[in-house]
Amino acid sequence: MRMSATVGIGRIPVRDVQPVVEYGRRPAKAVTGETFEVTATVFREGHDAVAANVVLKDPEGRPGPWTPMRELAPGSDRWGATVTPGAPGNWTYRVEAWSDPVATWRHAARIKVPAGIDAGLVLEEGSELYRRAAAGVPKDSGRDVLLAAATALLDDTLPVATRLAAALTPQVDAVLARHPLRDLVTSSDPLPLLVERERALYGAWYEFFPRSEGTPHTPHGTFRTAARRLPAIAAMGFDVVYLPPIHPIGTTHRKGRNNTLSATGDDVGVPWAIGSPEGGHDSIHPALGTLDDFDHFVTEAARHGLEIALDFALQCSPDHPWVHKHPEWFHHRPDGTIAHAENPPKKYQDIYPIAFDADPDGLATETVRILRHWMDHGVRIFRVDNPHTKPVAFWERVIADINGTDPDVIFLAEAFTRPAMMATLAQIGFQQSYTYFTWRNTKQELTEYLEELSGEAAAYMRPNFFANTPDILHAYLQHGGRPAFEVRAVLAATLSPTWGIYSGYELCENTPLREGSEEYLDSEKYQLKPRDWTRAAREGTTIAPLVTRLNTIRREHPALHRLRNLRFHHTDNDALIAYSKRVGSDVVLVVANLDPHRTQEATISLDMPQLGLDWHDSVPVHDELTGRTYHWGRANYVRLEPGRAPAHVFHVRRPSAAAAPQNGGSGAS
């Protein structure tokens, strides 16, 4: 076997290998155990057969067993194979293509031998090929099978049809599949693959303000009082607790309730206005407690199976120590004052933005120091506030520094901005990204956006679907009431491997600051907001049971841990959306009513092969939300009524896995 160097086009052209990020200059991404497809265009001159395989090379540089590719559609020249990397680290993958002389000979022999065209010569050629192939097969892996076939091909005491048949047996096929005869092997250039821990792709997040978790006697919460909330968060099935900034808050231009410019002495300020004489980004707000209290909070979270994600907002209040120690880090106007932050139409009079170009080295060094400080106290996830308002090169440098020694640390980009910026932030190192999910509410919007996210973008960008945030209360939730909160939770939890809610979502808090605003009235950004969780549970005014069930379903179904496996199915009513995810034998099918006001019905036409089924199959589908089981085939009637059931979340079972299913489609649910 001769390996051709990849110079120019290559002897067997290997073109357009996917996934590829920025022409291979940046790695495609996966997590441990995540299966993804590698594709390439492979062809050659003339009519001789070609074949191809994928080779993964682990972080130690060891190539794994090569994975055979298949032509994705006859005559397309597009080949593909799924691969699954193991341990975290920097992998590579490449596609090898080759001329397949055995397949070429078999095609010709099946035509010529029955027709009596040079039958003896054709069989002799086949015998030579099989002997060549046998030389590359270990003795205990079927070498004798190929040698026996080669001998039979030359046995002129047998009819030519029998001699040919001896070379086409399933046993021969199996040996050649494991050890093909490969001529003119040509390899693509290796492409980089970054494999990260599972949490980079999959998890359920819960955001809350520790300062709102006080007591009747001491309204301002501490880390000690906030830790009492952790068991309930864990019981709802969340994996990550995300905290807004926990640092000292400035008093200069402090915002009052509902973003008023005149704060009273009782106003607690905005956590994102970081810094005071008590300290900056490496300090804890005195009202929250001490660093020991924070360590206790992190320990308690871990005891309940929760990771801590800490907000990292690279900005300052006018009272931050940096303002005096590092004046070069800020934009100074001609009169000597520092311009406050703006994100039109929003203004942040209590915040100074950072100027990055005067001392980029100093800023990067200080940023890394701060991040490592919190890492030393158990934080392995950072939610980065507005990274799109800082230089991309700065984040690339900082993340590379952190992940170079601590590859398990995860950075979430809170960037609601232009697509090019969001994509680039993901490509230069951010493990996760906020998305436009909040503003995608119709069937067409959701389908188009999710097909984008689960397509080529999935090679570098991992979405985090927050159903709400302290900044964003979408009109859909404002006007849709509890049914809107329910269906958006279902969508977020089943469309994206990572989803989250901000505290109060489970209580369906939906009063806006004013009509047309996406801000909350009495926003928790500006004031304490204690909630009576016990009363809500007692009176049934919480959707926490639904949230808990959704997170349980997610944990029980590996298909929901992935993004690239998302497929949509046809509905004849655009108020209903249907989609599925499949990993191995685990198949989840979701049908959701996007209209929170009215009962909707539709016929759902399933793409059965996407479910791993034949077109004529009829299988039990078990609704994981209601416990009911139905028999579904290719076309199925669905009726969903807001207030009774926001959706069906079906586990598609094999017929032997369910007992006594109800015939037909679903009734009102």
UniProtKB/Swiss-Prot annotation:
Gene3D superfamilies, alphabetized: Glycosidases, Golgi alpha-mannosidase II, Immunoglobulins, Phosphotransferase system, lactose/cellobiose-type IIA subunit
Superkingdom, natural source: Bacteria
Cystine pairings recorded for this chain: none
SUPFAM superfamilies xrefs: (Trans)glycosidases, Glycosyl hydrolase domain
One Gene Ontology MF term: alpha-amylase activity
Catalytic activity: alpha-maltose 1-phosphate + [(1->4)-alpha-D-glucosyl](n) = [(1->4)-alpha-D-glucosyl](n+2) + phosphate
Sequence similarity: Belongs to the glycosyl hydrolase 13 family. GlgE subfamily.
Name of the featured protein: Alpha-1,4-glucan:maltose-1-phosphate maltosyltransferase 2
Species of the source: Streptomyces coelicolor (strain ATCC BAA-471 / A3(2) / M145)
Protein's gene: glgE2
